Amino acid sequence: MVVVTDVDLVVDFLNTVDHEAHTDVLSDPDAWRRWLTDRGLADSADARAVRTALRAAVGDPLEEAAGAAVPVTVELPAGGAPRLAATDVAGAVLAAASRLAVLGQWGRVKICPADDCRWAFYDRSRNHSRTWCSMQACGNREKARAWRSARR
């Protein structure tokens, strides 16, 4: 099983749809089962709705804003601090997103604005100004496109 941080879980879940490659892990039962198994999570009937809502929440222009609600619990381990817990992937992802929001890190989860990409990424820049999933790929391509357009 892969050790997954909240950032990894949220970003990996958002990227279960790849618009550039035209693939969707949720539509491939074997790939989805592997994805869940690698993270030690159970399936959820709400997975697609949660992904759509989260992608809209972080700025995917092609996803319509929608709410999503799934059950989570608050656990209080002996001698520990309260924590959100979930029994399936939808709850685990929303619990992870909630922890990011509480820590003030939710705004760092972004969607690449390149029309042919729309990959989710976590902005680790000091001033939260990263725009592209990768400056070497999408950023360079978009800047070159803008430069060519301006030269015409």
Identify the function of each model-found stretch.
Residues 1-111, 115-122:
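Short helix-coil boundary/hinge micro-motifs
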Residues 112, 133-134:
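Hydrophobic face of beta-strands forming the core of extended beta-sheets/solenoids
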Residues 123-130:
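Short linker/helix segments within small regulatory modules
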Residues 128, 135-152:
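Basic DNA-binding region of bZIP-type proteins
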